[in-house]
From Swiss-Prot:
Coiled coil: none annotated. The gene is rutA. This is Pyrimidine monooxygenase RutA. Belongs to the NtaA/SnaA/DszA monooxygenase family. RutA subfamily. It comes from the Bacteria. It comes from Haliangium ochraceum (strain DSM 14365 / JCM 11303 / SMP-2). The keyword Oxidoreductase applies.
Amino acid sequence: MEVGVFIPIGNNGWLISENSPQYQPSFDLNKEIAQRAEAHGLDFLLSMIKLRGFGGKTEFWEYNLESFTLMAGLASVTERIKLFATCATLLIPPAYAARMCNTIDSISHGRFGLNLITGWQRPEYSQMGMWPGDEHFARRYDMLSEYAHILRELWEKGESSFQGEFYQMEDCRVRPQPQGDMKLICAGSSDAGLAFSAKYADYAFCLGKGVNTPTAFAGNNERLAAATAKTGRDVSIYVLMMVIAAETDDEAMDKWMHYRAGVDEEAVAWLGNQGAADKTSDTTNVRQLAARESAVNLNMGTLVGSYENIARMLDEVATVPNTGGVLLVFDDFVAGVETFGTRIQPLMKTRQHTAG
């Protein structure tokens, strides 16, 4: 099973709490995380793109770096680990995105891939006059399908004359082509999102669910399997999990409860309001992000416990059919990656190939 890190491109990582570590994103922080992850044999890094945060006392995600340029920088200071940026497709035309990808492919010598998002938080785009209207919610995967088609053409052939509803190419040329096998990721969990992944993506990301329930996401894999049965493609799931680890279960749980006690209610309320804006689907992952149950960390799957129990639960993740890997976030990223590499990974049956 592959293991990657969802690096903290935004302030405070993925904990919306006054009691969690408070920090700003920086290249130096992410460089240290990237190099430690590579040294411990982890497989990939992914950075998101967030253009406006949730506010509140913690100003959650109000401070963010940009995904492509951050990953270009990290490509120059790493040697083996795979790198994925996230593309805000409402802002960046597909031909320009293809050229940026080709450039980072050159910097990284074939280690780069791209995560495509449609955009769901209206204020991110309306603040700069780029929100296409709420009808976007119903048509966003139609748009993204054209986007992905153009990317594939440009990467494979170096040119495209695709004529669609959303994009029109006229003898568009993007060269040199990438030296690596450019992989596409999508994180959509709605029926439309999974149908898109089944047709265009190489990997599909999903949110884990619950606290210490490492296989609770299995239903998402089953839904994707039904979608890929129609396309005949092999698309594996990578599941997002937060790890809060300590020497003992009690110590780890104390940290988790402390973070929960400090939840930034104002920021969580903003998330809830934005998550309710899409009226077209009940299966979108934004519904899970904004649910009240564990909004302190956007309701992602959370593994809390001793190093031994975290290792056991991560191995359980790998037992879910069609799971290709896990994408990890930590309460403290530098310490978390180091602890994972030295105390957790050596205990995992699915990571024994990294030993020594």
